[in-house]
Amino acid sequence: MKDVLLIKYGELALKGENRSFFENTLVKNIKYALRDFDGVKVEKTHGRIYVECEKDVEEAIERLKKVFGIVGITRAKEADLDLEEIFKAAVDLMKSHQGKTFKVETKRPNKAFPYNSMEVSRRVGAAVLKNVKNMKVDVHNPDVLLNVEIREKAFLYAGVIEGAGGLPLGTNGKATVLLSGGIDSPVAAWMMMKRGVEVEAVYFHSPPYTSDRAKEKVVDLCKVLSQYGRGMRLHVVHFTDLQLEIYEKCPARLTTIIMRRMMMKIAEKIAQQNGSLALITGESLGQVASQTIESLYVTNSSVSLPVFRPLIGMDKREIIDIAQKIGTYEISIRPYEDCCTIFVPKHPATKPKLEKVLEAEEKMDYQKFIDNFEEEVIEI
């Protein structure tokens, strides 16, 4: 008998012919998450993934809770396919639940085992009642559900720790997120990562109008997001010269939308260089002037790559709730301005016309900035 972590996954089981690809990617991501743990073994057999961890089990569980594709983690007992060994495992597991009501549920994928599920449940329950003090059976509303799985070995567990869910990172291609340092864009990145998308980030830095602390904030956000993946690459684009060009030569009410279009063009160029097939933004419909449906239409027309906006139908409270859950909120609210909050016009256009925007852009030579932007790449 030994202790293992039993990894449960949801959507992967529905992937048909591609199932092994998703499972193997999940195994790779689990190994990466536990890469600095000694004596860790990760094994995939018959629709289950098992993790053996000699020490620091609680820390291992905390790491695994951030691995996309895992819906649940259980601390399980692994026993030989022998009833007496199964009884010992059940008693050992249930000693920490003395005085509670319980129910035993058995699954028997291994049909070669000579006892059916009902018989295993009955016998395991009897062993618990005999050897653990003050236990009572309640088949309708038990305090503890003791699960028994009969596979190549027997696995027993009670209780499931919730995982991050979603799909394993790296199973749905790559995209590039425009990361501002605010509340929204890190949440948008996290939501796409949850769908299996590998993410690189672009941050637009405008010194001296934005400080190094603003850049450090974005680096810290990437560090949090990287805990859900396999590291992250951050592209820091120096945006001051192009931003000044916009505000000197374009109508004030159009400067915000034109700035967004220039950011999209530069982000698209970076995305195409790093193999991304889409851009990600943290825009939510109607939240600010640049996020009306008319503004988003004009913004989209600046690029050819698809633009994913996972927050588009969410309100601010919903976004903040996720930011707090994933650990980015306290970083995002640090009081350092990003380039989107400087030079903001008093009355930005909320329903810009594409032809008017294109006409305004002709007044400046933006292409030279896009072709020759200064970039710093930070590996996180």
Curated annotation (Swiss-Prot):
This is Probable tRNA sulfurtransferase. InterPro entries: Rossmann-like_a/b/a_fold, ThiI_AANH, ThiI_fer, ThiI_N, THUMP_dom, THUMP_ThiI, tRNA_STrfase, tRNA_sulfurtransferase_ThiI. The gene is thiI. Keywords: ATP-binding, Cytoplasm, Nucleotide-binding, RNA-binding, Thiamine biosynthesis, Transferase, tRNA-binding. GO terms for cellular component: cytosol. Its EC number is 2.8.1.4. It is an enzyme of class 2 (transferase). GO terms for molecular function: ATP binding; CCA tRNA nucleotidyltransferase activity; tRNA binding; tRNA-uracil-4 sulfurtransferase activity. Pathway: Cofactor biosynthesis; thiamine diphosphate biosynthesis. HAMAP family: ThiI. Its main location: cytoplasm. Transmembrane segments: none annotated. ATP binds at L178, L179, Y203, F204, R260, G282, Q291. Catalyzes the ATP-dependent transfer of a sulfur to tRNA to produce 4-thiouridine in position 8 of tRNAs, which functions as a near-UV photosensor. Also catalyzes the transfer of sulfur to the sulfur carrier protein ThiS, forming ThiS-thiocarboxylate. This is a step in the synthesis of thiazole, in the thiamine biosynthesis pathway. The sulfur is donated as persulfide by IscS. It is found in: Cytoplasm.
